[in-house]
């Protein structure tokens, strides 16, 4: 409230002439007080309306944030549940090939070998399409503990801590090691 608003009743008394009766001065002050009261009530009503509007906006924003969080949780859940769908679809031809191979009653060893090779190519292709790549280091490569697991150290005519042989391939998916390659490593001399 400004100084001007506080001084309104006092100004009413000051503007009253000395010839005015105390009742007239009192009536003038009451009229000014009533005007001030009306103005304050209007201001209060405006502030209450503004407060109610802000409270409503807050509740709407809160509800929207909660809905966004819930939608994000649902999307994460769906991604976990169906994220493997593409990978599973790429493995179906492999399963079909194995089923067809088992259905052949009198297959020769050559037919089995050709079928197995074709199935392995299908499997390798499915893995590569899904960013699953083999870790298959060559002999003489430097041992990398992040991608290789040393099974043993053997004396060898090569530089120490280099790979002598690969016992089992490893695999990575998008720079994350699924399984390290099992290797033997050249022992220090």
From Swiss-Prot:
It comes from the Bacteria. The keyword RNA-binding does not apply. GO terms for molecular function: adenyl-nucleotide exchange factor activity; protein homodimerization activity; protein-folding chaperone binding; unfolded protein binding. GO terms for biological process: protein folding. The keyword Transport does not apply. One of its GO terms (cellular component) is cytosol. Belongs to the GrpE family. NCBIfam families: PRK14139.1, PRK14140.1. Participates actively in the response to hyperosmotic and heat shock by preventing the aggregation of stress-denatured proteins, in association with DnaK and GrpE. It is the nucleotide exchange factor for DnaK and may function as a thermosensor. Unfolded proteins bind initially to DnaJ; upon interaction with the DnaJ-bound protein, DnaK hydrolyzes its bound ATP, resulting in the formation of a stable complex. GrpE releases ADP from DnaK; ATP binding to DnaK triggers the release of the substrate protein, thus completing the reaction cycle. This is Protein GrpE. It comes from Paracidovorax citrulli (strain AAC00-1). The gene is grpE.
């Amino acid at each position: 409230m400004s100084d001007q608003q506080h001084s309104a009743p006092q100004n009413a008394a000051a503007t009253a002439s000395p010839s005015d009766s105390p009742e007239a001065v009192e009536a003038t002050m009451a009229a000014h007080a009533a005007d001030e009261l009306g103005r304050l009530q209007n201001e209060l009503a405006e502030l209450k309306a503004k407060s109610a509007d802000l409270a409503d906006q807050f509740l709407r924003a809160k509800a929207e944030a909660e809905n966004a969080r819930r939608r994000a949780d649902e999307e994460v859940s769906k991604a976990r549940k169906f994220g493997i769908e593409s990978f599973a679809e790429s493995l179906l031809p492999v399963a079909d090939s194995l089923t067809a191979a088992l259905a052949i009653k009198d297959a020769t060893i050559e037919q089995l070998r050709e079928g197995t090779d074709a199935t392995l190519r299908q499997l390798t292709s499915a893995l590569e399409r899904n960013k699953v790549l083999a870790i298959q280091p060559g002999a003489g490569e430097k041992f990398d503990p992040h991608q290789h697991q040393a099974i043993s150290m053997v004396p060898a005519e090569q530089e120490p801590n280099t790979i002598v042989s690969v016992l089992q391939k490893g695999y990575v998916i998008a720079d994350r090691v699924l399984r390290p390659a099992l290797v033997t490593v050249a022992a220090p001399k």
